[in-house]
Design a protein with these regions (language model features):
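Glycine-rich phosphate/dinucleotide-binding loop and adjoining beta-alpha-beta core of small-molecule
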Residues: 1-5, 58-143
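YjeF_N-associated NAD(P)HX repair module
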Residues: 1-30, 34
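A general structural signal for stabilizing positions within well-ordered secondary structure
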Residues: 18, 46-49, 68, 86
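Residues at the starts of beta-strands that form the adenosine-phosphate
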Residues: 26, 53-56, 141
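Short glycine/serine/threonine-rich phosphate/pyrophosphate-binding segments
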Residues: 35-49, 56, 104-107, 127-130
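Short, surface-exposed connector motifs at secondary-structure boundaries
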Residues: 46-52, 91-94
Length: 143
C-alpha cells in the first residue's frame, strides 16, 4: 500500500477551523523513562502533527522537565505508581502506550492493559510487555 496525499485525504477526517482541541480528540501518551525521553518526545510530537487536539503525556518525574520543554503544547501528568494514571486514562479518548518505557513497562503496562474500554495503540516497550505476559491481553476490552 502506498500512502499518498490522496490516500490521506480519503482516510483522515477533515479538521474544520471552528473545531477546538476537544473536538479533535483527547490522547493520552504513556511513554518515556530515564534515558529514553526522546521516544516520548517523538511520539508526542507525532500525535500533534497528525491532528490530535488535546494531548496529555504521562511521564515519570525524572523526565518531566525534558518533555515540558520539548513539547510545550502537551499537558503533562507525572506518575510514580500505575494507579496515578487512572484519572488520565478515564479522561482520554484513546491511549498510546509504550515508547521508551524501558523497565517501567513491568508495572505500568499490566495496569493499563487491565483498565480497558478505550482505543489502545501499543508500541515499542508496550509490545515487549504484552509479548512477555500474553495472559494479560485478554483481561480487558480495548478497541
Amino acid at each position: 500500500m502506498e500512502i499518498t496525499a490522496r490516500f490521506v485525504r480519503e482516510h483522515l477526517p477533515l479538521i474544520r477551523r471552528e473545531y477546538n482541541k476537544y473536538d479533535r480528540g483527547r490522547l493520552l501518551v504513556i511513554a518515556g523513562s530515564y534515558g529514553m525521553a526522546g521516544a516520548c518526545v517523538l511520539a508526542s510530537r507525532a500525535a500533534l502533527r497528525t491532528g490530535c487536539g488535546y494531548l496529555n503525556v504521562a511521564v515519570p518525574k525524572e523526565i518531566y522537565g525534558i518533555l515540558a520543554l520539548s513539547v510545550p503544547e502537551a499537558v503533562c501528568t507525572v506518575y510514580e505508581r500505575p494507579e496515578d494514571l487512572d484519572d488520565a486514562i478515564d479522561k482520554a479518548d484513546a491511549v498510546l502506550l509504550g515508547p521508551g518505557l524501558g523497565t517501567l513497562r513491568e508495572h505500568i503496562c499490566p495496569h493499563v492493559f487491565r483498565k480497558g474500554q478505550k482505543p489502545l495503540l501499543i508500541d515499542a516497550d508496550g509490545l515487549n510487555s504484552l509479548a512477555n505476559a500474553p495472559r494479560l491481553s485478554g483481561t480487558a476490552t480495548w478497541s
